[in-house]
Curated annotation (Swiss-Prot):
Pfam families named in the record: zf-met (PF12874)
Subcellular location: Nucleus; Cytoplasm
UniProt-annotated binding residues for Zn(2+) 2: C97, C100, H113, H119
Annotated protein name in UniProt: Zinc finger protein 346
PANTHER family in the cross-refs: ZINC FINGER PROTEIN 346 (PTHR46144:SF5), ZINC FINGER PROTEIN 385B-LIKE (PTHR46144)
């Protein structure tokens, strides 16, 4: 039975239940039937307790614990918690060290920390009014937390008129002039600049479809606008092109020109020529006296038949039957005039026997 730890270099394993119980009684401040504080283990049964205290793993941790605390008296858990010398804000001393900003998984680890050089150094600095590592760590967290807010305020107050800090064309911000120079020399900025120049030339030309063969109506983005970089739009053909080369090829192609000519408004027609469609006789009027235009005004020819309305009546050509427009040449200087008669019922008719 090993009821003594010796100098901490060698630890004998207890054998049997009696040896384990004796070990627990002699070291009750770190061992118990339900918990091993050195290993931070919870023991829920008798068999588990025996297996744990008789294991080599437990013995190695006890040996390491003894080597750290060699020559020191064991401090009970109650005394360990009751020492408020270095506690802060009510925190448990065995769980965290506010001076070094460290947390512990067990009282053994906490005691090892408090006896180490780092804690002693930070404690001395705190007593002298210096800055400890825990204070530095907290200050770093505070700086990291406040940095995005400060950066946002700086961006909001940034002078966008300074080209070394902001590119209006690409909506890009720069931290230093070297970054701005690299941006302005890059392909992305040059492509955006060429696109804006092309759009400015086309939109400021002021040409109309009747004046220029390649007049366009483009809903182009203005320099520095938010719509920059989304393609080249041709409202005439209702398409969007991806590059400047495609746009130039489109506006110089036959499809765009045909679409442009189809949108050109037609000119108003002049008065019809003599003998045109307007020379056709209109529909006969109803009611009272007839006009003095003779039978041709009613749609009848001199022979008593209807006037033809075919293609021969266009272009000043004489109608079918050899009749010519007045004045008639001799011996036909007096054309036939129909005699209209008025009946007793008020209707107009012509005499067949005339």
């Amino acid at each position: 039975m090993a009821d003594e730890f010796g100098d901490g270099d060698t630890v004998e394993l207890p054998v049997g239940k009696e040896a384990v119980d004796a070990l627990i009684r002699e070291n009750s401040h770190i061992f118990s039937d339900t918990q091993c504080k050195v290993c931070s283990a919870v023991l829920i049964s008798e068999s588990q307790k025996l297996a744990h205290y008789q294991s080599r793993k437990h013995a190695n941790k006890v040996r390491r614990y003894m080597s750290i605390h060699q020559g020191e008296e064991f401090v009970s858990a109650k005394k360990f918690k009751a020492a408020p010398a270095e506690s802060s804000d009510g925190d448990d001393r065995s769980k965290c060290c506010p001076i070094c900003n460290m947390t512990f998984s067990s009282p053994v680890v906490a005691e090892s920390h408090y006896s180490g050089k780092t804690h002693i150094k930070n404690l001395r600095l705190r007593e002298q009014g210096g800055v400890t590592e825990g204070m530095l760590h907290q200050a770093k967290k505070l700086v990291v937390t406040r940095t995005p807010t400060i950066a946002t305020k700086i961006d909001n107050r940034m002078d966008q008129s300074d080209p070394t800090k902001f590119c209006k064309l690409c909506h890009a911000t720069f931290n230093n002039p070297l970054m701005a120079e690299q941006h302005y020399a890059g392909k992305k900025h040059k492509k955006q600049e060429t696109k804006t120049q092309l759009m400015t030339i086309y939109t400021s030309s002021g040409h109309t479809p009747a004046q220029a063969p390649i007049a366009i109506n483009v809903n182009s983005p203005l320099p520095g606008s938010g719509s920059a970089g989304k393609g080249f739009s041709c409202d005439t053909c209702n398409i969007v092109l991806n590059s400047i080369e495609q746009y130039q090829a489109h506006v110089s192609g036959a499809k765009h020109k045909n679409q442009l000519m189809s949108m050109t408004p037609l000119s108003k027609e002049g008065p019809p020529a003599a003998g045109g469609p307007s020379a056709l006789a209109g529909p006969p009027s109803t009611g009272g006296a007839l006009s003095s235009g003779g039978p041709s005004a009613r749609g009848f020819s001199a022979s008593g038949g209807p006037t033809p309305k075919g293609p021969s009546s266009f272009g000043g050509l004489p109608p079918m039957g050899g009749l010519m427009p007045p004045p008639y040449p001799p011996p036909h200087s007096q054309p036939y005039v129909r005699e209209d008669m008025m009946g007793p019922d008020g209707y107009t008719y012509f005499n067949k026997d005339f």
